[in-house]
């Protein structure tokens, strides 16, 4: 009996979501277009990083070669963005990576993904709100910070912030109120701030190229101190030239620059609020990443042309660079752009946060009252207010520098799961899920052969076991031209094995870096064997028949691109320190307590599995 109950629980955790086939039906308001999505993605991604991150990475890691660091980071982000784009075309519903995981790899993984997305958005909102407050305080002479230190100091070093940030709380309250008014209104404000930000960045790039000098990309160490006007012995000069810290410095800078592109995934949460989601979401993701890369590339190039990389101020590099060139008045233009960027960033974090909460509550995995929709504004008002309140409390009490890495680990985990979902789903047979049917036209749905549809109850508990026998021939040379249950099972097993192998490669590459450099036998053997097995398993997946489902957008070069995306994301996760992993473990313990205490028993999919599900025939009729 115990084994039977354990098996039943396992099936519950792996059940997959069957989504309503209706294309248009949504409780949310469909009012966003492609331009709105591009503005949302650019506003979320092109935030404080462009005004601060470029200086820190150029000075400490890459020098003028920071432009290559941003290029590598952009390519890594595009890999994840392409995977999000395909799922946006397949499943244009609210929920982003959470929903993508739910319809592909099962309920437990979906809950983990959604829970970490919520964490990322909350921390992103709180940290940028504090940055906005600090920037504004700096601009007016720091009276707010001085008042807080004198009258509101918190005596809990290492636990709470030195002073509470009331202004950050006010910012979050204003943005929360703006989001409760409606999607169209908040999107309009976002577009205005984003346009101002882009114009300021264009001004910075043009000014930098005009006032800059190519000599700053060709410096040697003996030219350093006179150029900076100081004799600081702590300044790192490297070897000079365009790539002063070598290619390893460029890669190290790319790992940091990757986080500058985090934010585009908020586009994928708008599936039920976009007029034409199958086309608008992929275009919005790719276009926003392209615009952000051009901005990061141009600003970092202008910055290192205007001023020697080793002289850059890591906190406020752009005002320092203009001052170095004798144009101190330009700092006001930089301040305007910085405040606009810091205004769109929390809006970009707060916009998807309640929508992920709403999607999880609608599915019964979080408390049901969080799924309430305001009748007038058609927004998830309870989820918006709740998430805003949590973000405000964190911004008020905590120094968030220790939580930034925690935000990154949650985002990278979501990216990895989405890439894995694309890899798995591309090789699965047709199922009655919206995963396939939402991407089709009504005429195409009329032609679906009902005999090819498997039952909804079977599909909920995972991919079905195969009737064929495993053999080298059936694995490497499948008979069918279309995906079957057997080929789908092979891909599932291969994807799981591939994840283990990639994790092994990343652990050895990061933790065994010195052993690899010294040629230690065990490190070389494990690394070589794991890489070869990764190539073999990827080849096995490539040999399986691929789904011919027509979509408005598909990731090219599958399975190679999703595998590369998973590798990059896991490698960056392994770069995070031990404290981050401990905090991540605590966050996950809270997640498991909620899921096993509430979610697994109140899941809507559990109700369907218990007998309330519609028959495959009725699901098909609904699509016609």
UniProtKB/Swiss-Prot annotation:
Gene3D superfamilies: Amino acid/polyamine transporter I (1.20.1740.10). The gene is Slc7a1. Disulfide bonds: none annotated. Residues 1-35, 83-102, 184-191, 263-282, 354-379, 425-487, 547-554, 601-624 are cytoplasmic. Interacts with TM4SF5; the interaction is negatively regulated by arginine. Forms tissue-specific complexes with ASL, ASS1 and nitric oxide synthase NOS1 or NOS3; the complex regulates cell-autonomous L-arginine synthesis and citrulline recycling while channeling extracellular L-arginine to nitric oxide synthesis pathway. The keyword Glycoprotein applies. It comes from the Eukaryota. Belongs to the amino acid-polyamine-organocation (APC) superfamily. Cationic amino acid transporter (CAT) (TC 2.A.3.3) family. GO terms for cellular component: apical plasma membrane; basal plasma membrane; basolateral plasma membrane; plasma membrane; protein-containing complex. GO terms for molecular function: amino acid transmembrane transporter activity; basic amino acid transmembrane transporter activity; L-arginine transmembrane transporter activity; L-histidine transmembrane transporter activity; L-lysine transmembrane transporter activity; L-ornithine transmembrane transporter activity; virus receptor activity. It catalyses: L-arginine(in) = L-arginine(out); L-lysine(in) = L-lysine(out); L-ornithine(in) = L-ornithine(out); L-homoarginine(in) = L-homoarginine(out). Glycans are attached at residues 222, 231. It comes from Rattus norvegicus. Keywords: Amino-acid transport, Cell membrane, Glycoprotein, Membrane, Phosphoprotein, Receptor, Transmembrane, Transmembrane helix, Transport. This is High affinity cationic amino acid transporter 1. The modification Phosphoserine is found at residue 618. Its main location: membrane. InterPro entries: AA/rel_permease1, Cat_AA_permease, CAT_C. Pfam families: AA_permease_2, AA_permease_C. GO terms for biological process: amino acid import across plasma membrane; basic amino acid transport; L-amino acid transport; L-arginine import across plasma membrane; L-arginine transmembrane transport; L-histidine import across plasma membrane; L-ornithine transmembrane transport; lysine transport. The chain crosses the membrane at residues 36-57, 62-82, 103-123, 163-183, 192-212, 242-262, 283-302, 333-353, 380-400, 404-424, 488-508, 522-546, 555-575, 580-600. The keyword Magnesium does not apply. It is a multi-pass membrane protein. High-affinity, low capacity permease involved in the transport of the cationic amino acids (arginine, lysine and ornithine) in non-hepatic tissues. PANTHER family: HIGH AFFINITY CATIONIC AMINO ACID TRANSPORTER 1, INNER MEMBRANE TRANSPORTER YGJI-RELATED. Residues 58-61, 124-162, 213-241, 303-332, 401-403, 509-521, 576-579 are extracellular. It is found in: Cell membrane.
